[in-house]
Amino acid sequence: MLVSYKWLKELVDIDVTPAALAEKMSTTGIEVEGIEVPAEGLSKLVVGHVLSCEDVPETHLHLCQVDTGDETPRQIVCGAPNVKAGIKVIVAVPGARIADNYKIKKGKIRGMESLGMICSLQELGLSDSIIPKEFSDGIQILPDEAVPGDAIFKYLDLDDHIIELSITPNRADALSMRGVAHEVAAIYGKSVSFPEKNLQESDKATSEAIEVAIASDNVLTYASRVVENVKVKPSPQWLQNLLMNAGIRPINNVVDVTNYVLLYFGQPMHAFDYDKFEDHKIVTRAARQGESLVTLDGEKRELTTEDLVITVADKPVALAGVMGGQATEIDANSQTVVLEAAVFDGKSIRKTSGRLNLRSESSSRFEKGVNYATVLEALDFAAAMLQELAEGQVLSGHVQAGQLSTEPVEVSTNLDYVNVRLGTELTFADIQRIFNQLGFGLTGDETRFTVAVPRRRWDISIPADLVEEIARIYGYDKLPTTLPEAGGTAAELTPTQALRRKVRGLAEGLGLTEIISYALTTPEKAIEFAVAPSHLTELMWPMSVERSALRQNMVSGMLDTVAYNVARKQSNLALYEIGKIFEQEVNPKEDLPNEVNHFAFTICGLVAQKDFQTQAQAVDFYHAKGILDTLFANLNLKVQYVPTKDLANMHPGRTALILLDEQVIGFVGQVHPGTAKAYSIPETYVAELDMAALEAALPSDQTFAEITKFPAMTRDIALLLDREVSHQAIVTAIESAGVKRLTKIKLFDVYEGATIQAGKKSMAYSLTFQNPNDNLTDEEVAKYMEKITKALTEQVGAEVR
């Protein structure tokens, strides 16, 4: 919100500098982004009166004699297409500074002396987007009353101070000059002074010319007035200046009045050309599928049933709350104007403007809320301005569909409630003074008082809101700083916290680096690596499609991080993350998703760099599985790895599901080469675990065993197997032999080559046996090996080599 300091002073009698005002506003709840003075950096710019203007043959140039208040006219060569004799212009005399600190000097153009420059607004630093179209390709023409030789700043209000406010959604009341005036008046204990317009109505009633109706629950009220015999022309200079300083391009007096009212009241308005209506009844309804509308910017908009439209003769003529239609726009020939003031549902307007990527000053205000109490006042004010600036005749009364409550909202609390929360010792008299400054009504006493909150402050509805207002006006800097009086409370980590801490420590001990990725991603990535995808939970109003859906897996976000690092030549990565995924078993539009803690990691590149002693070693499936084995061993959990080809984004031959108590709790494996290519990453291995399942399976008590003094015995066994037999199947077969003295199974060799028949492989294991209470004998171990050999032969078809 851009606030004119000059305009603000007309509404509130304050005697402070713009800088002091900005600082005070920032400390009381409305942040000031900065202050801009349009004239800053400009100098020696004066009013000039073009006495004569002669075309220079065979050029686009004009030789002008300009009165700049000096004894003799000043000769200036100008190339602007709209320069002519008799107009008042902006002249930069030699030594002047214009935009970009450019200095004007005497010079010669085509051999003709030029003692200055006739300037356009662009050359003064104004943006093309706010300059009136009639002057966008030429010089600015000043009002006839401008005096030659005077500094031009006061005529264009370039000496104003423009205060830029950063308005948070809860303070949308400050998206209007009246709202800002109320705020400033409360800060300084002043009163507001709003000008009144003398509206004179004709004998003809508005209801004779127009009728309005509402056919949607998303329209709270819709009101109109009619102004006849309007003369469309450029707005007076003061109004154009005000709009340009607010970042709005002046169009004509009718459109400019609606924009002025928007800035002044915060009430969006629209003006229709009544003579372009095919009917005299306006109906506001939801658009129908397949309908379209050409908006004022010339774009054809395809509408949906979620859009609101203003219709005449059942045809859309405006996109409600967003932008008017081209078919009924005001032009130079318009004579009868229909003014619209309405309140539309903010969510509906936000959805339409977001879908069409069509943001406007009007849609912004409807999205955040408007003051119900001034809808009709703003409508009357606009009609009175058209009467004044366009010489229009205002029909009596207005037509309205839908009623709004304009009564103050009553909120009750007590003095103790306020002081306890602020740590203050305010008296009831202090409370009365503060709410009087705010312009709020107050009844009751310190034991119970009720505040009547005007409709202009629709952000206040509960006692906590009153406390905030008291703190703001009293002064945040005056609130006492106290330390909590309560003593420390002994506590311990919850099981969830303890598990997270332990897993984090193990992961970092294994060389993984923690990252935090976005919980919001694209709908496609949200379910990409999910073992059991559920209903997708999507945001209704995402900032972008890249952050529009809640993730159902951790891996896709981690791969984004891998891709980011790989693109910057960092390809040896070992990352982990502990975070939440979001599962939705029911309707995501009606119920919140379940939040489940997950642990995931990813590794890629080299696990060992090449040097004079070591060969380079790339990560593989077993490195990823080794990380998990270490994790499960430290958690005292026993899992199974089951090969799977069902995960579309994982390599079908290098991926396994992880089972705990016969339940799938995660997966580990290589990212599918196609998926890796889509992410622009090298060969990458990932794993993801359900930490809630891990927590549920953790043993409640930790059992300690005495370290035995008896030695262990080791036996090696080499097996000839079919290539399809997995390591997990072999381990399962060995364990099924039921040898309770078997304490460790270690695979130490895998071989496939010329000495092994086709379709076969050799796997060698080291088996460790130990009796904690006695020495083992060779005979005992031999019996154990016979049992194990039998189990391997029967279950996996192994042949002992």
Swiss-Prot record:
Ranges of residues in domain tRNA-binding: 39-153
Obligatory cofactor(s): Mg(2+)
Entry keyword set: Aminoacyl-tRNA synthetase, ATP-binding, Cytoplasm, Ligase, Magnesium, Metal-binding, Nucleotide-binding, Protein biosynthesis, RNA-binding, tRNA-binding
Cofactor annotation remark: Binds 2 magnesium ions per tetramer.
MF-aspect GO terms: ATP binding; catalytic activity, acting on a protein; magnesium ion binding; phenylalanine-tRNA ligase activity; transferase activity; tRNA binding
Enzyme class: ligase
Ranges of residues in domain B5: 406-481
Classification via Gene3D superfamilies: 3.30.56.10, Bira Bifunctional Protein, Domain 2, Ferrodoxin-fold anticodon-binding domain, Nucleic acid-binding proteins, Phenylalanyl-trna Synthetase, Chain B, domain 3
Major localization listed first in the record, in broad terms: cytoplasm
Record-annotated FDX-ACB domain positions: 708-801
GO BP: phenylalanyl-tRNA aminoacylation
The keyword Aminoacyl-tRNA synthetase appears for this protein: yes
Tree of life domain: Bacteria
Binding site for Mg(2+): 459, 465, 468-469
Subcellular localization, as worded in the UniProt entry: Cytoplasm
Matches recorded under CDD domains: PheRS_beta_core, tRNA_bind_bactPheRS
A cellular component annotation (GO) from this entry: phenylalanine-tRNA ligase complex
Entry EC no(s): 6.1.1.20
Reaction it catalyzes: tRNA(Phe) + L-phenylalanine + ATP = L-phenylalanyl-tRNA(Phe) + AMP + diphosphate + H(+)
Family indicated by similarity: Belongs to the phenylalanyl-tRNA synthetase beta subunit family. Type 1 subfamily.
SUBUNIT field: Tetramer of two alpha and two beta subunits.
Cross-referenced PANTHER family: PHENYLALANINE--TRNA LIGASE BETA SUBUNIT, PHENYLALANYL-TRNA SYNTHETASE BETA CHAIN AND LEUCINE-RICH REPEAT-CONTAINING PROTEIN 47
Identification of the protein by name: Phenylalanine--tRNA ligase beta subunit
Organism: Streptococcus pyogenes serotype M3 (strain ATCC BAA-595 / MGAS315)
Gene that encodes the chain: pheT
